[in-house]
Regions:
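Hydrophobic helix-coil surface modules that form long, contiguous segments used
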Residues: 50-54, 62-199
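A surface-exposed beta-strand-loop module
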Residues: 1-39, 101
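Core domains of carbohydrate- and sulfate-ester-processing enzymes
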Residues: 25, 29-66, 112
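Hydrophobic residues embedded in beta-strands of well-ordered beta-sheets
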Residues: 7, 43-45, 83, 100
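Compositionally biased, intrinsically disordered/low-complexity regions enriched for serine, proline
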Residues: 9-12, 42, 58, 89
Length: 199
């Protein structure tokens, strides 16, 4: 697999901004594509990223090293029945219409850039935390994580304000092959953590 290639930009002066137009291959190692049969609801396909360790470069043109931290904005178009989320400012009240805009104001390393798309719905836990999941898992997930705000407040009492502003959780389909990934603003979780006893 190609794990990066040089991008040379020749400009007469030092521009403050450069726009790069690119397309990503469906075979990108940092993207996983699930057929509807591999999801909980079995109605819509699902896509998620796993950029850790050096797979962000397979779907986004960037310097894929933890030593480079950046903010980002993104505009994502999808089929209208699919909800798209990123490790950014996901709007819990966003309309599922196939047109999504994101902004990540805090600097992150490349392996924490994340995207997911599928039959996703949201339920609020607190003003700054909630759960995204397929509809069939939502109530169970919210019950499992209903103490999240108390945990955030306890951590803040020990270590100071939570730096990402929101802590939302995304419960992925049963075929998600990882335990989870602590992406800023949108932690990816395996559904196997939902056992009914809040552990």
């Amino acid at each position: 697999p190609i794990l990066g290639s040089k991008l040379t930009i020749e400009a007469p002066e030092h521009p403050s901004q450069v726009r790069v137009t690119y397309s990503t291959s469906p075979d990108a190692s940092g993207l996983q594509w699930l057929e509807p049969s591999m999801t909980e609801g079995k109605q819509l396909p699902f896509m998620f990223s796993q950029s850790q360790q050096i797979h962000a470069r397979s779907w986004v043109p960037l310097q894929d090293t933890p030593s480079v931290r950046y903010t980002y904005s993104a505009h994502v178009s999808s089929r209208p029945d699919v909800m798209v989320l990123m490790s950014a400012d996901n709007d819990p009240s966003a309309i599922r219409d196939g047109d999504y805009t994101f902004k990540m104001p805090q600097r992150i390393p490349s392996y924490l850039m994340a995207i997911a798309a599928g039959d996703l719905v949201f339920k609020r836990i607190s003003d700054r935390s909630g759960v995204w999941s397929e509809p069939a898992m939502l109530d169970k997930a919210v019950k499992e994580f209903e103490d999240t705000e108390r945990m955030i407040a306890t951590a803040e009492s020990l270590y100071g304000p939570y730096r990402w502003d929101r802590y939302d959780m995304l419960v992925l389909p049963p075929s998600f092959p990882y335990g989870g990934m602590e992406n800023p603003r949108l932690t990816f979780l395996t559904p196997t953590v939902i056992v009914g006893d809040k552990t």
